[in-house]
Amino acid sequence: MIQVQTILKAADNTGARKLMCIRVMGGSLRRYASVGDIIVASVKEATPGGVVKKGDVVKCVVVRTSKEVRRPDGSYIKFDENAAVVIKDDKTPRGTRIFGPVARELREKDFMKIVSLAPEVI
């Protein structure tokens, strides 16, 4: 469950390290984002020589959340951290690698490129 001001780890190689959510996409009163939702974030920490710089405003998709997500079969999935992947306007990742596992919910929300790049889909 991601809301405005939440700090997320960047799970790709765009150069961003930490992201801060500044908007949850999907309506003016939408407060929370979960796995597979798109957010607008500010880059708070970045590596030198990366694609994105500190202070850049980027679109991201949430790939891991500490808050559990309920699946249709009744099971729950949760991760140790909140993480996101920086994306372009056409829902493709800006980086070329994805680090760490991603949730299966991304497949249902048409983020197939992220799913194929991820080392593990849970």
UniProtKB/Swiss-Prot annotation:
GO terms for cellular component: cytosolic large ribosomal subunit. One of its GO terms (molecular function) is large ribosomal subunit rRNA binding. The keyword Lyase does not apply. GO terms for biological process: translation. Coiled coil: none annotated. Pfam families: Ribosomal_L14 (PF00238). InterPro entries: Ribosomal_uL14, Ribosomal_uL14_bac-type, Ribosomal_uL14_sf. Keywords: Ribonucleoprotein, Ribosomal protein, RNA-binding, rRNA-binding. Binds to 23S rRNA. Forms part of two intersubunit bridges in the 70S ribosome. Part of the 50S ribosomal subunit. Forms a cluster with proteins L3 and L19. In the 70S ribosome, L14 and L19 interact and together make contacts with the 16S rRNA in bridges B5 and B8. HAMAP family: Ribosomal_uL14. Belongs to the universal ribosomal protein uL14 family. NCBIfam families: rplN_bact. This is Large ribosomal subunit protein uL14. It comes from Desulforamulus reducens (strain ATCC BAA-1160 / DSM 100696 / MI-1) (Desulfotomaculum reducens). The lineage of its organism: Bacteria, Bacillati, Bacillota, Clostridia, Eubacteriales. The gene is rplN.
